[in-house]
C-alpha cells in the first residue's frame, strides 16, 4: 500500500532582525537534512535566503520567485497550502509569517486547512533579547501575541548579555507565556537536534492549542 505520511507544519515567527533567518538556515542545514521541505513566507518576508542555498538544501524552488515557494498568507492560504502538499508532498512545510504578523492568526489559518495529511507540528518565536522590553512597550499587540502563542521561544543575541539582563528578559517573557520552552543559550552553541527537540515538545504545544481554542 501507499505510504501515508503526514506533512508537518513548522511556524517560525519573530520581529525583523530577531534572527529568524539564521535559525531557519541552521535548521534546514542540520536538522531537516534529507527531508523534503517547502518554505512559505509572507509577502513581507525578509528571509532573504538565496536561491542557491535553498537549491543546495534540495528545497523546492519556484522559478517565479527568487528563492522559494512563496505564497502570501493574505491570499487564499488554505488553497495555497493544499496545492503545495498535493504538488510536492513535502515532509515539512516551514512557514515564516511577516515580522508584524500575529502568530495566533497564522496558527488559526493552518488549523482551518481541511486536510488530513497536515499536522501542526510546532510554532517557535525568535525574540531579540536586547529589545524584549522595548518591543513589549511599543509593539505590544503584535509582539505579545507572538510570545503568548509560542510553543518554544528562542532568545537571540544573548551572547554578550549579562546574567541580570538575561533573566530580566526571561521574566518578562514568562509573564506572557508560562509554559513555552525558553532557550537563552546562543543558537550557535546548540546543535540543531537540541533545538528541534525543544521546539517539538508536544506537551507545550497541546497547551497552547487548548488555550487558543478557548479564546
PLM segments and residue spans:
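Nucleotide-state-sensitive switch-loop elements of NTP-binding domains
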Residues: 7-13, 18, 22-136
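Short, hinge-like loop/turn segments at secondary-structure boundaries
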Residues: 55-58, 112, 141-143, 171, ...
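Flexible active-site lid/hinge loop adjacent to a nucleotide/diphosphate
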Residues: 137-149
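C-terminal accessory "lid"/substrate-recognition subdomains
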Residues: 149, 161-215
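Short histidine/acidic/glycine/proline-rich micro-motifs that form metal-
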Residues: 132, 159-160
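Conserved beta-strand/loop subsegment of P-loop NTPase cores
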Residues: 38, 93-94, 118-127, 147-158, ...
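A short alpha->loop->secondary-structure connector
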Residues: 111-118, 143-144, 170-180
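Short, Lys/Arg-enriched N-terminal segments with co-localized hydrophobic residues
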Residues: 1-5
